[in-house]
A protein has these predicted regions:
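Adenine-nucleotide phosphate-binding core of ATP-dependent small-molecule kinases
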Residues: 195-230, 269
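Short glycine-rich, Thr/Ser-proximal phosphate-binding strand/loop in the N-terminal lobe
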Residues: 20-64, 142-151
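Glycine-rich phosphate-binding loops at beta-strand->alpha-helix junctions
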Residues: 82-85, 228-257, 268-272
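Conserved phosphate-binding catalytic cores of ATP/NTP-utilizing and phosphoryl-transfer enzymes
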Residues: 3-18, 87-125, 133, 137-140, ...
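Gly/Thr-rich phosphate-binding beta-strand-loop-beta motif of the actin/hexokinase/Hsp70
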Residues: 7-44, 120-138, 182-185
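Glycine-rich phosphate-binding loop plus the immediately following alpha-helix
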Residues: 53, 139-179, 278
Length: 284
């Protein structure tokens, strides 16, 4: 509901295509916290860290991004916050924050800016740690979307569970999956209980780690297709973003399920922070 209100009441702001001045974006997500510093429509500093304490995590990444940009906190002219901790951060950094906005519209803006697709149509897929989003945009403005993670477990979390069972870091899962064949192992990401059962069973059956990783990625791609993309009129190109877009095996699986290789822009995990920095410059 919040996203619908934003789309209606802030359409002019959402149509903004360029960042101006010196602005910061903070994305307080369930798994990671990201910060971006932008100046004159360019990213000049960025940082991320696993999410722990909302304020401490955001302060850390903001300082890291500022150091990378060669700037100080006082140099920031405006800041935008998004993600689960956006209101807490909006209060903590209230001397700088001009925008506190839900992640669906902010992420969409960051995605089309990073992919250089601000004009025309596109579909954005964001597979997150707590939920999945599929968003259609026209000229950078969302006009339809669907959100969800089935049962108590969302797709990004399922990939983390798989990685732990394979005793690897989630950043290694994609390369492992690219070497496997998902058809050799059955996997279910729709529910944490059944997902764990499938992991235990397939590994107990002696399936290779490569095949299990590939099956996990394919299962997630199928979930997004069946639960999210069936609810919207998919438009092309397809832009895949968020932290899970760095898992190459998942991107491969999404392409196989959809029959179209998705675009994964550089810095795709920073969509929320980029969107926050860009949109907050509209208040200068």
């Amino acid at each position: 509901m919040e996203a619908l209100v934003t789309i209606v009441t802030r359409k002019e702001l959402l149509a903004r295509e360029r960042q101006a001045g010196i602005t910061a974006g903070l994305d307080s997500g369930s798994s990671t916290t990201k910060a971006v510093i932008m100046q004159d429509n360019k990213i000049i500093g960025k940082a991320w860290t696993p999410s722990h304490n909302v304020v401490e995590s955001a302060t850390f990444v903001l300082n890291e991004a500022l150091a990378q940009a060669g700037l100080e906190y006082k140099d920031i002219e405006a800041m935008g916050t998004t993600g689960y901790g956006r209101f807490t951060l909006g209060e903590h950094f209230k001397d700088k924050v001009k925008l506190i906005q839900e992640e669906l519209t902010v992420n969409s803006k960051g995605a089309v800016w990073l992919a250089d697709r601000q004009r025309g149509e596109a579909t954005i897929i964001d597979i997150g740690g707590m939920d999945n989003k599929a968003i259609t945009v026209r000229d950078g403005i969302p006009d339809n979307f669907t959100m969800g993670g089935v049962c108590a477990d969302a797709s990004g979390r399922f990939l983390e569970m798989t990685s732990r069972r394979l005793k690897i870091d989630v950043t290694q899962l994609g390369a492992l999956a690219d070497k496997g064949n998902w058809r050799n192992a059955k996997m279910n990401s729709y529910c944490s209980v059944f997902g764990i059962q499938d992991l235990v069973t397939t590994l107990g059956d002696g399936k290779s780690f490569e095949d299990v990783a590939a099956a996990a990625c394919h299962s997630v791609a199928e979930q997004v297709y069946e639960q999210q993309l069936q609810e919207i009129d998919v438009r092309h190109p397809i832009i895949q973003v968020g932290g899970t877009s760095l898992i190459s095996g998942l991107v491969t699986a999404v392409g196989e399920v959809l029959g179209e290789k998705p675009i994964v822009p550089a810095d795709s995990q920073f969509i929320g922070a980029v969107g926050g920095a860009l949109l907050s410059s509209g208040f200068l």
